[in-house]
């Protein structure tokens, strides 16, 4: 198996009391977490987010990105829905790791955008791997997702892995003066849909 289930516990948060499920990735030893709320194994599409770790945004309140605000918005949305899943993947810096992310930030301080910085360091613009998502969702009995993301490439990547994405739910939040170039680059070079004109996209049944 690509991932091994370790344990589950309660996780009280300001938004709701989630169940926290821990997994270890067999090939790398990375530890991943899934938060779930309500009955997600009833066969109906589940509101969910696949969120890659961002220490600076999620824990240190960085305004260089929109990651922390997206994480909070996703947890709030799941709590409001009363049902959902959040996959928290340990793929810092779109897969390049924390120290390389800081190196990329240094290049961005000198004028590079987020894609150019990755490429100057010898990395692809996005090095994340979503193959581990399917077995974690299968463990929880999730058959279909209403995926909170602005990234159509993420939808395609998950679909290519055999995950049924019934709908893309936009997640527009966290814009500020410090991340305007970052968000513009995600839209222009990484294909993210950042505008309000795309309210939702329903995929094939």
From Swiss-Prot:
Keyword Hydrolase tagged: yes
Reactions mediated catalytically: GTP + 4 H2O = 2,5-diamino-6-hydroxy-4-(5-phosphoribosylamino)-pyrimidine + formate + 2 phosphate + 3 H(+)
Annotated disulfide bonds: none
EC number annotated for this UniProt entry: 3.5.4.25
InterPro entries noted in UniProt: GTP_cyclohydro_II, RibA, RibA-like_sf
GO biological process, one term: riboflavin biosynthetic process
Top class in the EC scheme: hydrolase
Binding residue positions for GTP: 49-53, 70, 92-94, 114, 149, 154
Positions of Zn(2+) binding: 54, 65, 67
UniProtKB keywords: GTP-binding, Hydrolase, Metal-binding, Nucleotide-binding, Riboflavin biosynthesis, Zinc
Catalytic center residues: 126 (proton acceptor), 128 (nucleophile)
Cofactor(s) of this protein: Zn(2+)
Gene3D superfamilies according to UniProt: GTP cyclohydrolase II
Cofactor-binding details, from the entry: Binds 1 zinc ion per subunit.
Any one Gene Ontology cellular component term annotated for this protein: cytosol
Pathway assigned in UniProt: Cofactor biosynthesis; riboflavin biosynthesis; 5-amino-6-(D-ribitylamino)uracil from GTP: step 1/4
GO molecular-function terms, A-Z: GTP binding; GTP cyclohydrolase II activity; zinc ion binding
Family as reported in the entry's similarity comment: Belongs to the GTP cyclohydrolase II family.
NCBIfam families: PRK00393.1, ribA
Protein role: Catalyzes the conversion of GTP to 2,5-diamino-6-ribosylamino-4(3H)-pyrimidinone 5'-phosphate (DARP), formate and pyrophosphate.
Name of this protein: GTP cyclohydrolase-2
Lineage, uppermost ranks: Bacteria, Pseudomonadati, Pseudomonadota, Gammaproteobacteria, Pseudomonadales
Gene name of the encoded protein: ribA
């Amino acid at each position: 198996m690509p991932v091994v289930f370790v344990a589950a516990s309660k996780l009280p948060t300001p938004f709701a009391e989630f169940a926290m499920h821990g997994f270890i990735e067999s090939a790398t030893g990375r530890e991943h977490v899934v938060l779930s709320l309500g009955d997600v194994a009833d066969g109906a599409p589940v509101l969910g987010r696949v969120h890659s770790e961002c220490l600076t945004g999620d824990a240190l309140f960085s305004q260089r990105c929109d990651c922390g605000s997206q994480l909070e918005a996703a947890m709030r949305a799941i709590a409001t829905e009363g049902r959902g899943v959040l996959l928290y993947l340990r793929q810092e810096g779109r897969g390049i790791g924390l120290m390389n992310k800081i190196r990329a930030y240094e290049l961005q301080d000198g004028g590079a955008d987020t894609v150019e910085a990755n490429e100057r360091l010898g990395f692809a613009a996005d090095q994340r791997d979503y193959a581990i998502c399917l077995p974690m969702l299968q463990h929880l009995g999730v058959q279909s997702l209403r995926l909170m993301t602005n990234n159509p490439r993420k939808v395609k990547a998950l679909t290519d892995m055999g995950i049924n994405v019934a709908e893309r739910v936009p997640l527009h939040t966290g814009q500020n003066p410090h991340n305007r170039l970052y968000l513009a680059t995600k839209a222009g070079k990484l294909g993210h849909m950042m505008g309000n004109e795309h309210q939702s996209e329903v995929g094939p049944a």
